[in-house]
Amino acid sequence: PAGPFRIPPRXRXEFQ
């Protein structure tokens, strides 16, 4: 992937 924005922020915490 090109970044953490491809997967929804479900416990990932990368969407902050």
Swiss-Prot record:
Additional detail: Antimicrobial activity is not affected by salt concentration.
Assembly information from the UniProt record: Heterodimer of a large and a small subunit.
GO annotation, biological process: defense response to bacterium; defense response to fungus; killing of cells of another organism; xenobiotic metabolic process
Protein name: Antifungal protein 1 small subunit
Lineage: Eukaryota, Viridiplantae, Streptophyta, Embryophyta, Tracheophyta
Top-level division of the source organism's lineage: Eukaryota
Keywords tagged on the record: Antibiotic, Antimicrobial, Fungicide
The keyword DNA damage is assigned to this record: no
